[in-house]
């Protein structure tokens, strides 16, 4: 994590804390929005790769094909429990390192329980997706191979490395690096060996299902629920109403994408913004608001991204 990444996280906090205050003070009353009916399911991600300011679209829930290793039986799930000075986290081998629990040591809910930012809706986080050469969507959500740190308290940075075999001898690897005194988790993805099997040569990594409310008065928390993308000095956001579903995709270099609640945020910050092909944000509101974000990256290069999961 370099100085530019630290600066990016600082700017994210400044933008997201002060933008709502500015809008409340200076923005005119919004005109009623005309909402088109859409069918995008938040749990299946975003239609990445569209042009900027993409309109809402109607689409059927896509069938998601799970890749399995052609040479190995399905692997059993492994759970790696980590304790840092700031939080306790549990990482699953599903999807090559999805975070299935993330509870803070210094933040508590109305029942005096540690705030946990992971629930049943957003367990599909940090997942990698792409289309095969036939254009079929691929979700690498099964268990990946892992033989490393078994869990426990960490006093220095600890890297968890996962891999999955797409075809004989061709692997995708993903690593997550944790630090004892930071909410930042560094992510590295190497898909170079499978780039010939990736349609358009790009894959996505994203966070789906947003963050749960943590306030006793959930309605007050929901006011702040949004997803954001920051490109070229411009901030775009998605805020949905009950019954709505919306997604927007933006081509080109991306500084960061984020999902926030009143007090917490999850954000993906590419180490090299120019490496990003496009970014997408969106959300749906049926039983509750849930927001998504993802970035599209080239399989031809190793990609390094920082995840911030913590307080604003």
Outline where the language-model segments fall.
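Subset of Sec-pathway N-terminal targeting signals
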Residues: 1-42, 166
């Amino acid at each position: 994590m370099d100085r530019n990444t630290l600066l990016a996280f600082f700017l994210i906090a400044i933008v997201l804390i002060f933008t709502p205050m500015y809008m409340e003070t200076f923005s005119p009353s919004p005109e009623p929005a005309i909402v088109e009916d859409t069918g995008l399911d938040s749990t299946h991600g975003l239609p990445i790769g569209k042009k900027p300011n993409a309109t809402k679209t109607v689409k059927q829930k896509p069938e998601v094909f799970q890749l399995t290793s052609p040479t190995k039986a399905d692997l059993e799930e492994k759970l790696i429990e980590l304790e840092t000075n700031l939080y306790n986290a549990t990482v699953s081998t599903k999807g090559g390192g999805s975070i299935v629990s993330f509870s803070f040591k210094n933040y508590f809910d109305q029942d005096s329980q540690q705030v946990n930012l992971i629930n049943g809706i957003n367990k599909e986080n940090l997942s990698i997706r792409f289309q095969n050469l036939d254009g079929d969507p691929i979700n690498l959500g099964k268990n990946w191979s892992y033989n490393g740190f078994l869990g426990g308290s960490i006093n220095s940075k600890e890297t968890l490395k996962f891999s999955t075999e797409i075809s004989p001898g061709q692997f995708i690897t993903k690593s997550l690096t944790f630090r004892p005194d930071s909410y930042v988790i560094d992510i590295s993805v190497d898909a170079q060996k499978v780039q010939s099997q990736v349609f358009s040569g790009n894959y996505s990594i994203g966070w789906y299902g947003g963050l749960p409310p943590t306030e006793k008065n959930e309605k007050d928390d929901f006011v702040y629920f949004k997803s954001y993308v920051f490109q070229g000095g411009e901030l775009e956001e998605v805020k949905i109403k009950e019954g709505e579903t919306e997604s927007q995709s933006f081509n080109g270099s991306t500084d960061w994408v984020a999902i926030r609640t009143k007090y917490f945020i999850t954000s993906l910050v590419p180490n090299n913004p120019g490496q990003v092909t496009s970014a997408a944000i969106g959300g749906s509101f049926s039983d509750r608001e849930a927001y998504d974000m993802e970035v599209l990256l080239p399989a031809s290069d190793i990609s390094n991204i920082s995840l911030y999961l913590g307080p604003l």
